[in-house]
């Protein structure tokens, strides 16, 4: 969370940057602008690829998994991975299976944005051909030549819980980022409603893996060139599934809603994002909430 005192925020940012530099010393990390440029080049090439990032709660769960040999996850870890990322049930067998899948998927990415969360540093030691970049490379509105401009004329699939709002906002795309080529006109837009298990919400599925399989099935039935994914802990595996079935995939995770001009509490006071807000931006449709949204970082996406 950003500090209200600008000097304290500046000091915190400096310290965070210093820790990142020391911890990732020796890792070749592209600056955010260069990562954005590479993503745009990959999109223009038409080749399958995965550009994503590791989730914070997911990487803390992986840290527990690495430390305890796949069992004895802490109560805090079980609660957070359920409420903040939507993984269920949270027994040892499920979390062990989840961590194995998540690590394997992260290590297979063509481009991975790093931001020093949980076991991320340990996980990337297993990357063979992955290129790394700074986190803001994933968010196109930060850049003069946004990677998202390369979505023009492409068949785009979005996997996200806010299906209704995204479809409505896309129709207002020219109003969302005036003067910037952030959200161009696609050849087509398909939105798959992501399963929402955040905050302990009942999903109607027996397990996280059952829900994952169903969303993969829906993706396979869609006609698309590029997938943009923001679906909690499902995001990285779903993006990898898109890549593995011959598509380009970018895992924007929580920031996906910003691409479509959808406000969220976590950005209301953000020094950059809040200034992008304009009268065309909206909150998620009231039908797209969850019963316990306050459990999700205080309702940060609504």
Please annotate each region the language model reported.
Residues 2-185:
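Electropositive, gly/pro-rich neighborhoods at or near active sites that engage anionic ligands
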Residues 119, 196-198, 256:
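Residue-level detector of flexible, active-site-proximal loop/helix-junction positions
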Residues 160, 224-239, 251-253:
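Glycine-rich anion-binding loop/nest that anchors nucleotide
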Residues 237-302:
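C-terminal functional extensions of proteins
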């Amino acid at each position: 969370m950003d500090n209200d005192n600008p000097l304290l925020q500046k000091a915190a940012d400096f310290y965070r940057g210093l820790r990142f530099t020391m911890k990732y010393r020796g890792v070749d990390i592209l600056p955010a602008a260069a990562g954005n440029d590479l993503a745009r080049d990959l999109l223009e090439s038409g080749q399958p690829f995965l550009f994503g990032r590791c989730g914070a709660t997911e990487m803390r769960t992986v840290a527990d998994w690495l430390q305890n040999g796949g069992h004895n996850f802490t109560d805090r870890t079980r609660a957070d991975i359920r409420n903040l990322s939507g993984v269920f049930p949270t027994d040892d067998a499920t979390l062990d299976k989840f961590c194995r899948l998540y690590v394997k998927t992260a290590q297979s990415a063509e481009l991975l944005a790093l931001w020093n969360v949980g076991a991320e540093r340990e996980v990337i030691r297993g990357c063979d051909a992955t290129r790394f970049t700074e986190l803001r490379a994933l968010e196109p509105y930060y850049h003069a030549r946004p990677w998202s401009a390369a979505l023009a004329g492409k068949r785009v699939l979005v996997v996200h819980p806010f299906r209704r709002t995204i479809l409505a906002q896309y129709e207002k795309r020219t109003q969302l980022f005036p003067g910037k080529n952030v959200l161009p006109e696609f050849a087509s837009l398909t939105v798959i409603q992501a399963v929402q298990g955040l905050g302990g919400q009942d999903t109607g599925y027996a397990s996280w893996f059952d829900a994952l399989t169903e969303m993969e099935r829906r993706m396979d039935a869609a006609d698309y060139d590029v997938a943009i994914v923001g679906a909690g802990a499902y995001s990285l595996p779903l993006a990898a599934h898109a890549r593995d079935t011959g598509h380009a995939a970018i895992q924007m995770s929580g920031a996906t809603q910003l691409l479509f001009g959808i406000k969220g509490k976590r950005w209301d006071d953000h020094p950059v994002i809040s200034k992008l807000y304009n009268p065309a931006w909206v909150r998620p449709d009231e039908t797209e909430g969850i019963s316990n949204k306050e459990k999700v970082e205080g309702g940060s996406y609504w």
